[in-house]
Amino acid sequence: FVDAEGYTHAPASESLFGSALPRPAGKIDTQTSYIVPLYFGLFNEKNKQLAIEHLKEAIARSHNTLTTGFIGTPYLNLVLSENGYDELAYTLFEQTEYPSWLYPVLQGATTMWERWNSYTIINGFGPVGMNSFNHYAYGAIQEWMFAYSIGIQRDEKQPGYKHILLQPRIGGSFTYIKGHYDTVYGRVESSWNKSDKEYTYQATIPANTTATLYLPVTDPSKVIEN
């Protein structure tokens, strides 16, 4: 009963939250403070655009590095790509300065760490009280990698990958991306190549499934199907 009563107030709470203006710079102006409500669709359309701009400014202030923790990191690149900022998402993904996904790799990481600096070549190991070297949280970036970089997404209206959304976002310094996902119906494969003259995209879906393909082009007449 308590849960049911709480849910009845959810739309009103969402409306109240969404109509509140995002705070100006310097007042609770963190990356996560914008990422989470943007991901869950809590802002109205006017304030959504303001929140996106505030988020971009917050990222710029940190010199295109992450200031998010376990709550904001999983949604950061998803929010950027869902709102058309794929290049910024790729910039964060390829960042090597601290704190970033690739910074630990340059320090010798072969797993996901609990901290961005669990170990550094210069300073050695971080505090033992919070320093797991096998910690999933920051590895949540793989959802963005599958959904937008590789371009394989589930259709929530047809669960189980009966219908598949293929939506590759070509960007960053990459010239080639390939990946697959094994569904209950079989393997979905998606890959793209980028050259100076053209983009090439290939996909394979299992038998007895369908897919909708979204390509990042502005002129459909330039799309050639093979």
Each predicted region: which residue ranges?
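Catalytic cores of carbohydrate-active enzymes
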Residues: F1-F125
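Non-catalytic C-terminal accessory modules of carbohydrate-active enzymes
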Residues: E87-N226
